[in-house]
Amino acid sequence: MSGISLSLRQLDYRDWFQRKISRDIYGNSTWLTGIDLQKELTGHTGCVNTLDWSADGEFLLSGSDDTRLIVWDVFNEYKPRHLISTGHVQNIFSAKFVPYSNNRQILSASGDKLIKLFDLDSSKEGGMDHGMETQTRCWSCALDSVKNIVPCDNGHTFLVCSEDGTARQYDIREPHVCNQDLDCPSILVNYNPYRINLYTITMSPSNPYYFAIGGTHPYAFLYDRRMVKKSFRDDWTMNTSPEKDCRCVRKFSPDGSCNSQGILDRYITCCQFSAANPNELLVSWNSDYVYLFHVHEDKSYTPTFNKIEDSNKKPSKPSLLQTQPLKRKNYSPWYKNNFGASTPASRVSRNPYTAAQPRKHTFYQMYENIEKFFTTENGGLYESIVSGRLSHFSRSIQYVKDAIYFLENYNYIPDSNGLNHSIRVSALRYWRACVSILALMDDTVSLEPNTIIQAGWGWLYDFMNWVTRYLLGISDHWALQMSPPTNVARQNFVLCDPDEPSRVLFSNPSEMIRAFARIDTNDLSSVRRFFWIHKVLRGCLLLISSDIYWEQFQPWDSSTSDVTSSQRLDDENGFLTLLEPPVNYENEVESSSGENIVSMYTGHSDLNDDDDDYQDEESYSYASDDDDESDEDSDEGPTLLSLRMKKRKAVEPNVPVNTHVKSYYGHCNVESIKNVNFYGQNDEYVMSGSDDGRFFIWDKLNASILAIIHGDSEAVNVIEGHPRCPTLAVSGIDSTVKIFNTENTPPSGCSRNHTSNSYKIIATNEMNRQQGSRDSYITSRMLSHLAYRAHLDDGFGHEVLDTDACSIM
């Protein structure tokens, strides 16, 4: 008996030790820095769209485009334990173990609009392969692809969302027959009348009556199942509204607002409640970032689609770009936060710069005039500008900022003489760099988010950004890493003195970079400062300008008609008379004392308040709300877009909106539907995939990037953390599942951990994200409708396109 007691004590001690090890290691930040690929699981023949660990951590479930489910035995080297041929005829988007079923029951949802329940105990044949004999239930209520399944913790009920705009609740114990209409008792939320597709649904584990949904609408919605009128069958009619089915109690949006354009081009790819902290909700937007919300946040915004001013809102920490609450996709918090906490507030403007006067020059004339600010030859104004006369300097700054604003927001594109898009982007970047360099020459100049160099534009811009940040006191000397110069740049680069073109300052990029790196950070004399600003950076500007085909502006300018004057800045007097200051402008400048010298323009009363989003260097301006109204009132009648916008504005109009408390950036979420997840013993980390084939892990509290791991050849869409062990399962476009932990040390040069190269990765992703934010999206509903209208038949009554086969993940 004593031997048995000793064995029991040993078992208890072993269990206690294992639990302690799990608590100490699981989600440890030190472990995260050493994470790498352990194993790659092969068995699927299509993209793996869904992963789910069993509650005990013994099995991993995966579902794929090949319509099969595989259950992997975790503690038997991840060998396949069960292979299920589901009978689905389209991609499997979601698959989950049913709680309390001893890992024997599995739910699956597919693009064929079906939800199926499989019971492995019902298989009559032994072995690993299973077929339709294991299917015990099938629900066919949805009118479109079923995207997500969330099992309830009771083991009987589960929630689903579909691209038909509905969220539904089922009970596996109850029989259910449906004729695929909207008169169905399973419906909790019905957004079908608003033409909204739902992509994600999540339920709070601690408060299971709360669930959140998101899709092709800029808001995420929180619902309370306790307010569902399930007892009154008469309430379920064809005209059932979301308010009658289930009550929405909160909406979520970054900064608590969205603009009109966002109603159509922004959508949510994933929502996820925290298991450890029921008040926390993660939401991921396409072409945007991951945001953390507090469900019961006291501070909420009045729901509106107009511009929201919150002058009392204080930023969480000082930064260079302390702006208006961030209006989506225009400039990045990555750039904002990397400007550091030490930035003088006097150099900061809260709003993007906005011109206060009409355009007086063609764009080619603007180029010629701005060139004069940095040259001394051929009537150059450089010496006059830097001579110390504030009126010269402030007006030159205003002129460049106006040029940026006009080119960003000019939307007239002639059919025959269209301005090359790459030239437009190059010009905007160059003029932004001009503003940054001018800001170094005078301490009273403020920077706006649309007038600053951003990382990722190229190695020379990165170098100028590095120098500018350092000289402005924005970051320490080594705070910014650079992308390496290209081979062409190494061969052709020669930087000459802008005042003495025959004098070579640097003959290759490496020489210039090393020279700046050797600067004594504690002793930057005025002579050195003058050299790097007025010689090196000014020379870089002229070098960049020489590579831009400015002549392409001329034929485009000739077809424009909004220029009020064609006067050039031929001399200093012409320059001063052309830029006539507004009333009290000189007094404003002279009394600025370091404040924004153009603040009077950013709040000009004539500006369109609905134009919340300034367009950066790669975008064209969109129609404002006023434009939408005028379209609706035109002789041609309302447009499809205006009608859709009106419908989506009407979704839950009186529900309070919560703003985010944290944002996580660095990844790119444009090309596919990606999930987002918590990780750690107390959900202290945030994880998301990226279009570059990597996945990111952030510290939840300070939003810093802890790890960047390569997980797929194209894009990582799914990341799931093991419930007990420090292990991650990752999948994406590849047909394999990757298992990541720290058990294996990869050979030198073979590591998938790319955290050390974070700067270049983040900069590249930011550029791709901004480009993707301007690409129009198209849903499967839209694609099917277009296909139906365009290809009903081939003219002889023969169908040439199966619209039901059109599906987008």
Curated annotation (Swiss-Prot):
Biological process per Gene Ontology, one example term: negative regulation of fatty acid biosynthetic process
Tagged with keyword Repeat: yes
Alphabetized InterPro entries for the sequence: DCAF8, WD40/YVTN_repeat-like_dom_sf, WD40_repeat_CS, WD40_repeat_dom_sf, WD40_rpt
Cellular location(s): Cytoplasm
One cellular component term from this protein's GO annotations in UniProt: Cul4-RING E3 ubiquitin ligase complex
Cysteines paired by S-S bonds: none
WD repeat segments: 43-82, 87-128, 141-180, 193-233, 241-295, 668-708, 711-750
SMART domains: WD40
Spans through the membrane: none
Keywords linked to the UniProt accession: Cytoplasm, Repeat, WD repeat
Ranges of Acidic residues composition bias in the record: 608-636
Region (Disordered): 599-644
Pfam families: WD40
Role description: Ligand-dependent coactivator of nuclear receptors that may function as a substrate receptor for CUL4-DDB1 E3 ubiquitin-protein ligase complex.
Quaternary state and interactors: Interacts with ddb1.
Name of this chain's protein: WD repeat protein iqw1
Source species: Schizosaccharomyces pombe (strain 972 / ATCC 24843) (Fission yeast)
Taxonomy of the source species: Eukaryota, Fungi, Dikarya, Ascomycota, Taphrinomycotina
